[in-house]
A protein has these predicted regions:
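Active-site-adjacent structural elements that line small-molecule/cofactor binding pockets in enzymes
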Residues: 1-300
Length: 300
């Protein structure tokens, strides 16, 4: 089992110090958010809270994920970084491939790409993209980015992504994993079909056996059941070593936790409680060290 955490709602000035601490104490990965902007009003409910509300302050600072990752990569040696998730359907894949390859060069390939579908119609409308095409657009973008990262001249001709032979340099020295996020069947199917793994939203531990079975079924459907596949799970109520070992036995490869969160919180209330805590940088660093000493050490 590998361990990581997400830096959503963490002040930008704390990122490097937190990354250095996690790197020193044996964490595997850090995830960062992607949010180009937050509309004051949205026309659809947020899909991951019971009442559809957005749980974060709209003026919360969110760095561009590639900037945040680069800032942390230059002060660390080992830990990996993952945008989770990059809203790929609203982004231009040639430019995203360039950003990813550039960050990979700076980070010595300690980066993966986590992608997902943006959920706000306003994002698509104001960026001039037809939201109805987002699934197919993302499929093509994933395939095009994979090609571009291979090096040499590449071309791609899809309905939404279309370019003649181009070359991009530098390119990564090793394969950069692409993880697909989302809780819906189409998202999980996309992960099984095109991804090197799946990124979860927040789930409780009693949901996990059915989720893993569903992912494995889709992988068999696409003939990929024998390929390596990471499952990166965010499960706040997996609080004990025994809980985590049971998840590992189910096939979970990576557990995303919030080490400074309140132990035992339910998934649906976790984020709100974390916000109420407003932990200091020192509290976060102490929690990162404590979790590494008491939990991660059991899996080395």
């Amino acid at each position: 089992m590998r361990f990581g955490f997400h830096l959503f709602m963490v002040p930008p000035e704390e990122l490097q110090a937190i990354a250095r601490t996690a790197d020193e104490y044996g964490w595997d990965s850090i995830q960062v958010a992607d949010a180009p902007f937050f509309p004051e009003k949205v026309s659809v409910p947020y899909p991951y809270t019971p009442d559809g509300s957005r749980f974060w302050p709209l003026d919360m600072p969110v760095l561009d994920p590639w900037v945040a990752i680069t800032a942390m990569a230059v002060v660390t040696q080992r830990i990996r970084f993952i945008p989770s998730v990059l809203r790929l359907a609203i982004r231009q894949p040639l430019l995203e491939a360039k950003s990813l390859a550039s960050v990979a060069a700076v980070a010595q390939d300690r980066v993966a790409l986590g992608v997902g579908l943006a959920w706000m119609p306003e994002e698509f409308r104001w960026l001039g993209i037809d939201m109805k095409t987002r699934g197919k657009r993302q499929d093509e973008a994933i395939q095009a980015i994979r090609l571009l990262l291979q090096g040499g001249f590449q071309e791609f001709h899809g309905k939404h992504v279309d370019f003649d032979r181009v070359i991009m340099a530098p390119t990564p020295k090793k394969k950069i994993p692409i993880y697909v996020g989302g809780a819906t069947p189409p998202a999980m199917q996309r992960a099984a079909r095109l991804g090197d793994g799946w990124l979860s939203v927040i789930h409780n531990k009693d949901e996990i056996p059915a989720i893993v079975a569903e992912l494995n079924r889709y992988r068999r459907d696409y003939g990929r059941e024998n390929e390596a596949f990471d499952i990166m799970l965010h499960c706040p109520d997996a609080t004990t070593v025994d809980d985590i070992k049971r998840l590992q036995d189910l096939g979970i490869t990576d557990l995303q936790v919030t080490p400074w969160a309140i132990p035992g919180m339910a998934a649906e209330e976790g984020v709100g409680k974390i916000m109420q805590q407003q932990p200091t940088l020192q509290m976060k660093q102490d929690a990162i060290k404590r979790y590494a000493d008491t939990v991660i050490a059991q899996f080395i």
